[in-house]
């Protein structure tokens, strides 16, 4: 079973780093997917809903600023990917063989074979789906945070 992994929030100065993990079924319309950064918000939200409805499994994970400050942003992103993968794995407990494909040039600390794919969010449908999950969940969190703390923009 292939699980795509990606993160959102490594560049911004505020908020959590968020990772997405996605396992797509064979009949998923992968031709609709793109890197989340290449999609309009409207299209990204539609694809987010489609992924949530049709993925074989999907999950997100947040690592919060306090931990980011303690372990650094790169390690936090990898930890978030590992946590998101663990959540996906629990959704499919009968799967014996796993393989992760992670966007970027490093792999998260998971106990299954994992390959780093540079620009994977533009190449691999499972990573594209994970990218959409991560960006959408992080954006939703940041919009809620803005309502609570509007002075921070």
Describe the predicted segments one by one.
Residues 1-153:
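RNase H-like, Mg2+-dependent phosphodiesterase core
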